[in-house]
């Protein structure tokens, strides 16, 4: 506190990935959580993750605008901001609350090439148009780092681009910035990558898993309970 001052943002995720809400007054619980944060700092902002059933609508309704910041945790796969194509679609998104367009990308620290370039770009600009009053930035929410840096470069550049662009256009600039030269061979390689391994067409929990990491079985489909060993690119 002496070095950094009093914190402004406080994270709390009640009933995350389960937890029984039976008999719980969710509105009252939400208010109590925020009140505890306000005792530490009267300007405190509650940061909450949007994942599965969270944040509960009753809590969203009970908290005043400006007191909560929602992380749309996996905007590239299961957004809740109001994308009708999402399996976790919410018609009103997060209502009056500010939120961040986040990319989860990595699950469980698995290492491998993976991304959804088109989905990340299209989703961001659709969200900015539909929720321009509450969308206030982007976030990275990965469970592992030191892989797929191109995807983070792409995501973090989005807020700086007022006009929508294509991944093909962006990749050309990325190649020049990454290698410090304009080489047609490098552009070709990265265009191939952006159309295949970095443009996954479906929802999945990160990179393709190796069957050698799975438990022995006659048929192996994944190494983890959430992943997939099915290739999505040629």
Regions found by a protein language model. Give the residues of each.
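Catalytic-core regions of glycoside hydrolase
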Residues: 1-194, 199-232
């Amino acid at each position: 506190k002496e070095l950094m001052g009093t914190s402004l943002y406080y994270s709390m995720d009640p009933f995350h990935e389960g937890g029984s809400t039976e008999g719980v007054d969710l509105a009252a619980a939400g208010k109590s959580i925020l009140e505890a944060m306000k005792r530490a700092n009267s300007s405190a902002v509650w940061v909450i993750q949007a994942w599965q059933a969270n944040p509960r609508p009753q809590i969203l309704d009970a908290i005043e605008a400006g007191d909560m910041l929602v992380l749309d945790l996996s905007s590239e796969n299961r957004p809740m901001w109001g994308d009708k194509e999402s399996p976790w679609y919410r018609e009103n998104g997060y209502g009056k609350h500010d939120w961040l367009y986040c990319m989860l990308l990595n699950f469980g620290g698995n290492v491998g090439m993976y991304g959804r370039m088109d989905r990340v770009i299209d989703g961001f600009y659709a969200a900015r148009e539909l929720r321009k009053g509450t969308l206030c930035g982007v976030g990275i929410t990965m469970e592992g780092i030191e892989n797929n840096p191109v995807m983070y470069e792409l995501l973090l550049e989005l807020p700086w681009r007022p006009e929508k662009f294509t991944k093909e256009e962006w990749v050309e600039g990325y190649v020049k910035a990454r290698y410090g030269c304009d080489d047609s061979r490098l552009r070709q390689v990265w265009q191939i990558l952006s159309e295949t391994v970095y443009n996954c067409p479906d929802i999945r929990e990160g990179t393709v898993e190796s069957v050698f990491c799975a438990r022995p079985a006659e048929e192996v489909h994944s190494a983890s309970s959430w992943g997939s060993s099915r290739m999505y690119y040629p």
